[in-house]
């Protein structure tokens, strides 16, 4: 990897120009062949990055300062350091942008981890104590910024795939980790608050854990203030289908269980879906329920076709 554009920190490397993908347009920004197609760069800077088969490439060089800033945030977030600049642009301001507010006190952390295949993680900033949902990279500037925001009281781990650097985060902040017992395994030990059963669990007045087995046996989503659903890998917005979506292709435990888990969500109100993988969605209550019902119908249809 090329030297850091972020002021010497070891957490932020750049891609190698000799590995630059041929599909990149000419210019400063590029993606190299270590890209794992996590989609985050396309979410953060859609005017710059696009899909090319099973990887991302630069389809258009940034045309404005805002466009360049978005591309640099994608560089910082990239879990595999697959984005680079020929001129080694400084990413200090992009580093300082995270955690980045999505809505009110809910933030996206950037700094995705390769060990969670580039999953998104989130921070809920609240007077009762901040909640880290799934794990970003344990990167010094992000740690410092979260310290400034009040630290982390609780880590909510939706499932076994997206735990990344959970031990480092929990140890640094003395945070209580919450995870369903059915997803605890040798790589995830020392969970302070293991959840059990299939019934919803009120963690605090504004936080409800809803077990949603399917993607994994112990997958659990987090509902915050009946407004934000942190959905892990259970549910996401599909850019291709323009709808809420789940896929049997990434269901590692039970598709029939995942359908039943999806039906459970009809009992709740929320207007945001904030996934680990896939796109975010914000819809009004009626549209969210309509989308959810349609997703369930497609899942059942897919199940019948498979049978």
Question: Where are the regions that the model predicts?
Answer:
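Pre-active-site segment of Zn-dependent metallo-hydrolases
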Residues: 115-116, 126-154, 187-191
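Short, positively charged and aromatic/hydrophobic N-terminal segments
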Residues: 3-5, 9-13
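Metallo-beta-lactamase
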Residues: 53-54, 89-104, 130-132, 138-140, 144-147, 152-162, 164-217, 250-253, ...
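Zn-dependent metallo-beta-lactamase
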Residues: 13, 22, 67-127, 266-269, ...
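Cysteine-centered iron-sulfur cluster-binding motifs in ferredoxin-type domains/subunits
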Residues: 29-45, 65-81
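Short, charged low-complexity linear segments at domain edges
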Residues: 14-25, 43-60
